Amino acid sequence: MERRFGLASGKEETLEAIGKSYSITRERVRQIENDAMRRLKRPNTLGEARQIFSSLAKHLDDHGGVSEEQKLFNSLADGRLHNHVNFLMALADGVTRSGEDDKYHHRWYTKKEAREAAEQIIERTIDKLAESKKPITRERLFGIMKDNARSLMGDSPSEDSLDSYLATSKLIKQN
């Protein structure tokens, strides 16, 4: 786990690199990693770390329940500790990592519904921006996002939440 998450060196290692050093396959390393995570997640193993996990979830909830990974890590710790934050997030119950794709950066969320709502708000905002094909101010962008949120969720998220949603998108850039 130390090498996989880069807890000592600050540099994460691939399954393949770890496997080569032990002369085992990367699939075997994956199995060992999964077993170690399962064991670490046992209720009697983590004890005092539960408070940290609930604080991480609350931090995410305070930002709309969704946050782009680097933005989240930067808001929680100095860069040299990001690997440790990543490890804690991976252990935490109630938070889930969503992988990167063509539209979105790596992101963490507390509830599937929050992630889906954020994605719908972003997608509707992209559609609206495509209609005008012109740059707009940040205030106007947030206005569009608030309108989309109201039509989807019935109310408007906070500025922090909208900023968090915006950071997840690869398709909307800010100048």
Spell out what each predicted region is.
Residues 2-175:
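C-terminal non-catalytic scaffold/interaction domains in large multidomain proteins
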